[in-house]
């Protein structure tokens, strides 16, 4: 029996299923979480299937969370989607259910859960949920197809990143054949507000780039207040430095309210997630996140990125 069949058996065995995802969600986190919820609701209308977590204001157009009570976890199956390690799981009640399943595509550095399905070759967790439906012959409702397509598009950078495979395109084509409003979804995913556009201009104006293509920019709390932006809204400009031809690796340091920095790191070709692991983070080889607790640590992270950029140059 493969892992997908094992997961389906567990789903069939429980009356209540609660689905989690990571903090500071992106389209793949919400797409896989709520896409799975809607898939299971369509297949098992007699079951209670709930999605929990903080409603990210910039993504409520994609989906909103359910109200989940403490007592809902009694005897429940809990599934965590798109979350590499336990500190990043949104809503710590995930520990209070009866059985825990992890479904993810990040490196499996934290093998939590009673049953795990981790495929690091997958472009996204949304791709895995769509594959789950396909392989087990489960009919996807329109709402789930829309969510899973959004998750795939989000995590592949519109099919730009290296994890985009033949299977990714095949699954995306299958989802696209289901009649959700593709044009409206694509337009929404490509839209930023004026405040974010101005921040992007600031990033280009203030980006520090060394001779090897390592780049960085720091966004302070004062700057975020000036642009009237939340930390979550800065996610829209993370890819901006990569559009510059001379940039190969980059980091955006975003100061948090408590003074520490959330660090978003990206690379065009060279592996950077080992740097993230050394600084309270992790992620994919070319797209990772870390945490820094001083300006000196910011400098250290940038120096490590510079070293990566220098290594095997070209």
Predicted regions and their residues:
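Short alpha-helices
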Residues: 106-171
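Short, hinge-like loop/turn segments at secondary-structure boundaries
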Residues: 66-70, 118-121, 268-269
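Active-site cofactor/cluster-binding pocket
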Residues: 61-115
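General beta-strand structural signal in soluble alpha/beta enzymes
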Residues: 19, 51-53, 102-103, 140-142
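Glycine-rich, phosphate-binding/catalytic loops in enzymes
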Residues: 35-37, 95-98, 118-119, 170
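A generic local secondary-structure boundary/capping motif
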Residues: 69, 90-92, 116-119, 137-139, ...
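Hydrophobic helix-and-loop "lid/oligomerization" segment in the mid-to-C-terminal part
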Residues: 2-23, 27, 31-57, 70-76, ...
């Amino acid at each position: 029996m493969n892992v997908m069949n094992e997961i389906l058996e567990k789903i069939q065995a429980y009356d209540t299923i609660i689905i989690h995802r990571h903090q500071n969600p992106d389209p793949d986190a919400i797409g896989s979480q709520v896409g799975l919820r809607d898939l299971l609701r369509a297949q098992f209308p007699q079951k209670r299937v709930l999605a929990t977590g903080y409603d990210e204001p910039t993504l409520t157009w994609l989906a909103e969370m359910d109200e989940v009570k403490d007592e809902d976890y009694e005897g429940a199956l809990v599934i965590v989607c798109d979350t590499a390690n336990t500190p990043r799981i949104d809503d710590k009640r995930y520990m209070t259910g009866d059985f825990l399943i992890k479904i993810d595509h990040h490196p499996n550095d934290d093998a939590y859960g009673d049953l795990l399905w981790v495929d690091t070759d997958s472009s996204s967790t949304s791709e895995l949920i769509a594959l789950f439906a396909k392989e087990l012959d489960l009919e996807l409702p329109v709402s789930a197809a829309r969510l899973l397509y959004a998750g795939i598009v989000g995590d592949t950078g519109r099919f730009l990143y290296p994890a985009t495979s033949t299977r990714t395109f095949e699954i995306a084509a299958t989802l696209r054949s289901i009649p959700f409003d593709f044009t409206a979804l694509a337009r929404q995913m490509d839209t930023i507000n004026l405040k974010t556009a101005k921040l992007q201009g600031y990033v280009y104006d203030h980006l520090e780039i060394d001779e090897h293509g390592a780049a960085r920019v720091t966004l302070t709390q004062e700057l975020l207040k000036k642009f009237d932006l939340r930390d979550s809204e800065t996610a829209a400009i993370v890819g901006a430095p990569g559009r510059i031809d001379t940039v190969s690796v980059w980091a955006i340091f975003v100061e948090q309210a408590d003074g520490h920095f959330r660090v978003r790191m990206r690379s065009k070709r060279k592996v950077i997630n080992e740097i993230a692991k050394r600084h309270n983070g992790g992620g994919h080889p070319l797209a990772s996140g870390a945490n820094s607790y001083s300006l000196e640590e910011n400098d250290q992270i940038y120096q490590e990125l510079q070293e990566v950029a220098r290594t095997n140059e070209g």
